[in-house]
Amino acid sequence: MAEVRDVYTFDDLKNWSGATGDLDRPARLSVFGDPVKHSRSPQMHNPALEAAGINCEYVRLHIQPDDLAEALNLLKESDFIGTNVTIPHKGGVHDAVDEMTEVARRIGAVNTVAVDGDQLLGHNTDAPGLKKAIREEFSMDLSDLRIMIVGAGGGAGKAAAVQCAMDHCERLVLVNRTVEKAEALAEELHDLVIDPDKLEGPADRLVAIPWESEAMEREMENVDLIINATSVGMKRTDPEVVPASLIEPHHLVYDMVYAPARTRLIADAEEAGAKAANGLSMLLWQGVLAFEFWFDSAAPAEVMRKGLLESLG
């Protein structure tokens, strides 16, 4: 039997039985990306499939944007169960699926596709994955928190904001370098966040501000949870996400960056006496929820956690 390759291509997908027919298990799940070699999804999903007794292999597929629509159609012809989707395809897949969940529709992005006959069903597990991660890390629900999201204008930030709004968080502060993007998102989320039957507190429940220290300082007194939804922190030379002087012991800090495990933001939070966690738990839970979307049964989450941790060394 042949070894599973690190990455398969669009040309492979066009002749899927020829490209994968001699594998031990049929390759019926994948992750689409461009690039895709960095994806840790196979290290999570393949142990889970084995533990669940499902005869299936999960592989990486390098799909370029121009080939995306045809690649999605080929899934139906090649007996796929589904696929995950990573950069840069989440918006393109959103436009191509036949049906989608409410959270995917509101975010405008799909990261998980299930094949159902001749239909493609889209979901976004990044958003509910964040919800699960916050619960696991801090034993708190989004609905009970006043939340600041830094980088709300990006894809990860919008996913976080939509989930917080759908859960009716106590307060939502959207921070973005281009404040117009944060303001546009606030307008989209207004009806979810602003409850006419709920009395306003000492601060507005939905705010959009620029990514500037003075603007953030004005809001920080009325914030419990700070979420970094930017890529700032991946390099040691990166600037501060939040000025260290603004972080207080009562704050909860969640950094979606997970490599390095201890970013500057996490270090600053811990030095301030605040609880902090990196994005590894969100990566895990979005995978768990994707598995459950495909199979409509509980995923072996701890098996997936072990695979993910082993992939990181």
Located regions from the model:
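Rossmann-like adenosine-cofactor binding region
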Residues: 200-276
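Short, conserved loop/helix-junction motifs that constitute active-site signature segments
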Residues: 22, 142-143, 168, 242-251
